[in-house]
Every structure is written in C-alpha cells, then in structure tokens.
Amino acid sequence: MMVVKKTVRSPGSATVINAIATGRGSAFGIGLRVEAEAELIDSGVECISREGADTSLMELCTRMVIEHYGVDAGVRVVTSSDLPVASGLSSSSAASNATVMAVSSLLSDEFGLQPMEDFEMLNMAVDASLQAGVSVTGAYDDASASFYGGLTVTDNMERRIILREPMENQKVLIYMPDRKSLTAQSDVPRMKLLAPWVDMAFREVLDGRVHSALTLNGILYCASLGFDPGIALDALEAGALAAGLSGTGPSFVALTHEDSEADIIDAWENLEGDVLVTSVDNEGTRVLE
C-alpha cells in the first residue's frame, strides 16, 4: 500500500505593529519557512522536529485536527525549518499553521471528509498557540501573515483581519543576536505602557505608511524591552526603508531595496550574532504538490 504524505510549507513573519500593547497588530510574511510532513500511522500521535525543537505545540495541533474530524487515526508529523525559534519571527505561528494544514489535508483526503476552511485552520492554530502558552495574545497578526502571506493588519482580541494585501517585494534583512526571547516570558505590563504611541504607529500602517509604522513600533518596543534602538538606526543610516525590533525580539528586521543591502549588512556585521537575508513572502501557507 502506498504511504500517503501531505507536505505543507508555512512562512514566518516579521512585525510591523506588535499587538501586545493594544491588542491590534500587523505583520508580513517572510521567506524563512517551516515545512510539515504528515502521514498516517497505526495509532497515536508522533511529532518530530528535525532541528530538535520542542514538539508540544505540534502535538497539540495534531490532536486538535484529529478531534475536529472525529476519526480514529494515528498521525506522524515531521517538521523541518530554516526559521529560528524564539527570535521574534513567528516560528510558533508558522509551525502551528503548517501542522494544522498538513494534518487537515491528510485526514480530509484519506477519510473523504469535508476539508476545513482557511479561517477554521487559522483559528485552530491560534487556539493551539494560546493553549500551549507560546503566545500572549494568540498572535493573530503573526498567524494570519504566516497563513495568508503578504501584509495583514488585525484586531487580535476579536480575531478580525482589518486589512490584508500583498506586500511590495523588498529585501528583508534580519539581525539575530546570540540570545533567544520567548514571547510568553516578556514583560507585558511594561509593554502596555506604550499603548498611546503604538496606536500612532498603528494609524500609520492603516494609512499605507508601512515603513514608518514598522520603524516607530520597533523603536518603541526597544525602549520597553531593553533592546538597543541604535541597531535599527544603524540600518536606517545605511539606507534601509524601515528598521525595528520584530515581535518581542531579539531579532531586528530591516526592509530595503537591493542597492542598500550590502551597506546594511556592513552596518550590522560587527554586532555579535548573524545577519540573514531573505525576501517578502506573499504566498502564505500551502500544500506542496
């Protein structure tokens, strides 16, 4: 008997507006991804991360999908990723989205069942992130940008997408310091102090000024979380269109056209850590044929 597998690729995302201060946020898909491969096994749930990451979120997602379809099935999910964990690049949202879609596609095909709608898969992935304690707000902004690709602007409390559109194709440069930052361990009361100013950044993105929104948000959260805003300013000085902290850090993201790419890398190369170069992802989470 042929073993049926379903493989799904899901992009990470970078922050335009961090939703923790106000409950409203914005993010866009990036070209670093999680890939999840799902297949049926005799019984139980097996989850394996090729990078050795914690699999509890994957296991929760898998069990939630099995429960949704009401089938007696064993499922194995194996993930691989070039998306760093605990870095502010939505690794948890991408892993949730990839796992939910892979297992859903597998079970609906194998058992001849009605596939889940996109919004159902997205909501299930967000529920799993909240239940697993890897997110403060459920990260609906990050999760929706990862799921649909492009730019999303969201009300995380209401789980509502206010705006969704393709993102202009730009280079995305990411500075990753030699430290991790788990969102659920962040100082939430301190971030909520920023609400009036984060609201100003939020209005910028609604008015189409994504670059200024990203930069303002990124510098505000640097102040709240104790990161050095000079890292973003160095990128801006080198020609970046926008630069700021992504998520709750520790990664910084800069958007640029190709002509400034080398200058920004030069500006960051003396910092401890790595600089990654990728691009905007407008495809989102999808089953690979």
Swiss-Prot record:
Cellular component terms (Gene Ontology): cytoplasm
EC number: 2.7.1.71
Matches recorded under InterPro entries: GHMP_kinase_C_dom, GHMP_kinase_C_sf, GHMP_kinase_N_dom, GHMP_knse_ATP-bd_CS, Ribosomal_Su5_D2-typ_SF, Ribsml_uS5_D2-typ_fold_subgr, SK_arc
The organism's place on the tree of life at top rank: Archaea
Binding site for ATP: 84-94
Molecular function via GO: ATP binding; shikimate kinase activity
Keywords: Amino-acid biosynthesis, Aromatic amino acid biosynthesis, ATP-binding, Cytoplasm, Kinase, Nucleotide-binding, Transferase
Subcellular location: Cytoplasm
Pathway note: Metabolic intermediate biosynthesis; chorismate biosynthesis; chorismate from D-erythrose 4-phosphate and phosphoenolpyruvate: step 5/7
A GO BP entry: aromatic amino acid family biosynthetic process
Reactions mediated catalytically: shikimate + ATP = 3-phosphoshikimate + ADP + H(+)
Top enzyme category: transferase
Family: Belongs to the GHMP kinase family. Archaeal shikimate kinase subfamily.
Protein's name in the database: Shikimate kinase
Species this protein is from: Methanothermobacter thermautotrophicus (strain ATCC 29096 / DSM 1053 / JCM 10044 / NBRC 100330 / Delta H) (Methanobacterium thermoautotrophicum)
